[in-house]
């Protein structure tokens, strides 16, 4: 099970528990959810520090500022690949650039082409 699936499952469990108790507006339940989210983020950052070199982490931080959703997706894929043992550790900036290109190409929408025919 990958970290994203674990996170989604925990989030669903917490939401179901909050609804069952009628505590959706309860500040304690909200605080608990925020705390669990913070723990998840800290764990993710710890793994990324182990996987990425300093330059690669810097590049990922800049990507996160410009495109947060893409950066989140890249982080999840990096963690999955590292857990599967498919990445050299620590990941160099050059290797990271290549991975970013591949991930971007996979997620890029198909190029739309318009042809104008004149009579």
Curated annotation (Swiss-Prot):
<feature type="compositionally biased region" description="Basic and acidic residues">
    <location>
        <begin position="1"/>
        <end position="12"/>
    </location>
</feature>
<dbReference type="GO" id="GO:0005829">
    <property type="term" value="C:cytosol"/>
</dbReference>
<dbReference type="InterPro" id="IPR002836">
    <property type="entry name" value="PDCD5-like"/>
</dbReference>
<protein>
    <recommendedName>
        <fullName>DNA-binding protein MMP0157</fullName>
    </recommendedName>
</protein>
<dbReference type="GO" id="GO:0003677">
    <property type="term" value="F:DNA binding"/>
</dbReference>
<dbReference type="InterPro" id="IPR022889">
    <property type="entry name" value="DNA_bind_arc"/>
</dbReference>
<comment type="similarity">
    <text>Belongs to the PDCD5 family.</text>
</comment>
<dbReference type="Pfam" id="PF01984">
    <property type="entry name" value="dsDNA_bind"/>
</dbReference>
<feature type="region of interest" description="Disordered">
    <location>
        <begin position="1"/>
        <end position="35"/>
    </location>
</feature>
<dbReference type="InterPro" id="IPR036883">
    <property type="entry name" value="PDCD5-like_sf"/>
</dbReference>
<keyword id="KW-0238">DNA-binding</keyword>
């Amino acid at each position: 099970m990958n970290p994203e699936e674990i996170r989604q499952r925990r989030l669903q469990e917490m939401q179901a528990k909050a609804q069952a108790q009628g505590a959706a507006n309860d500040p304690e339940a909200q605080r608990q959810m925020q705390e669990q989210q913070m723990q998840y983020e800290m764990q993710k950052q710890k793994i990324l520090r182990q996987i990425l070199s300093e330059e690669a982490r810097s590049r990922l931080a800049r990507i996160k500022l410009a495109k947060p959703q893409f950066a989140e997706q890249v982080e999840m894929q990096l963690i999955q690949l590292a857990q599967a043992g498919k990445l050299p550790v620590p990941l160099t900036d050059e290797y990271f650039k290549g991975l970013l290109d591949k991930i971007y190409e996979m997620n890029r929408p198909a190029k739309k082409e318009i042809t104008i025919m004149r009579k």
